[in-house]
Amino acid sequence: MHNNNAAKNLDMLKIMDMLEPEMRAAGREEDFSFFVINHVLLDSISRLAQQTAPDRDSVIRAFRDYAHRKVPKLTQCKSYQAEARNRRIIMFLNYHGMERLAQFILNVKKKV
């Protein structure tokens, strides 16, 4: 992916911050965790890792920091545990700052 809109992805975190109090007040903590691990940790970081934007790494770091704050113990999160094994592997790698390895695995999988 060769676009340079990495910083625009930070809007996702603003939306998540607006969504969080509503979901927690309604007793939907697990649903919020689902959004964090799927949309922030998996989709957004994986998409950003493919970009060539100069600020890509700092934006990925912001997403990873957000995931750490909202889901401090990833492997104990019920939403994480409910995911398929391959998705959990990519989430785990993204959570721990190994998004390049995650992208390598995904690219190899595409070619097989």
Residue ranges of predicted features:
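Flexible helix-coil transition and linker loops at the boundaries of alpha-helical arrays
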Residues: 24-33, 74-80
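Amphipathic, non-membrane alpha-helical segments in soluble helical-bundle scaffolds
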Residues: 5-9, 29-34
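Short helix-capping and hinge/turn segments at secondary-structure transitions, especially at repeat
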Residues: 18-28, 46-49
